[in-house]
Design a protein with these regions (language model features):
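N-terminal strand-loop-strand
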Residues: 6-51, 55-56, 77-78, 101-103
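The catalytic Nudix box helix
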Residues: 51-85, 99, 107
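Basic (Lys/Arg-enriched) interaction patch that binds polyanionic ligands
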Residues: 1, 8-13, 65-73
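Nudix hydrolase/Nudix homology domain
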Residues: 1-3, 45-49, 91, 111-149
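Active-site-adjacent beta-strand/loop module that shapes the phosphate/pyrophosphate-binding cleft
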Residues: 87-110
Length: 149
């Protein structure tokens, strides 16, 4: 039975409350000087360029997930991981937690199973098609850090 005022269901026989499970996911926008790294994901139907993202693994901190996903998806090392904000994704029961990070080292080497292309975009570069502000936290993250001349 749904419990009024709470996000849980309670068994009428034993009183056990069951709360929905969430799958935490991270998103990170990497900065290098006055440029940001944007990527186009292979599974994206929108063809937007956006920040890197991925799910946490069991036993992993969110910060460790940022470092792991960045290295796995584009072969880069980052530092100065800073919280930006979060957004619930009720379908499929996720919580997207967004960060910024600063580039340390490496050359872009995409994992072709996840990333179609990735590149640095600075203030003098034509800016790619990115998620709009109202669609997701990605749009807000990118616009807040979009390189300006």
């Amino acid at each position: 039975v749904h419990v009024a005022g709470e996000r849980c269901a309670r068994c009428p026989a034993c009183g056990h409350s069951a709360y929905p499970r969430i799958s935490p996911a991270m998103m990170v926008l990497i900065r290098r000087g006055n440029a940001i790294l944007l990527a186009r994901h292979t599974q994206s139907p929108t063809r937007f360029f956006t920040a890197l993202a991925g799910f946490l693994e069991a036993g992993e901190s969110i910060e460790d997930a940022v470092h792991r996903e960045v290295f796995e998806e584009v072969g880069l090392k980052v530092t100065n991981v800073q919280y930006f904000g979060s957004q619930p994704w009720p379908f499929p029961h996720s919580l997207m937690i967004a960060f910024t990070a600063d580039y340390v080292s490496g050359e872009i080497r995409v994992d072709e199973s996840e990333i179609a292309e990735a590149a640095w975009f600075g203030p003098d570069d034509p800016f790619p098609h990115v998620p709009p502000l109202g669609l997701s936290i990605a749009g807000h993250l990118i616009q807040a850090h979009r390189p300006r001349a």
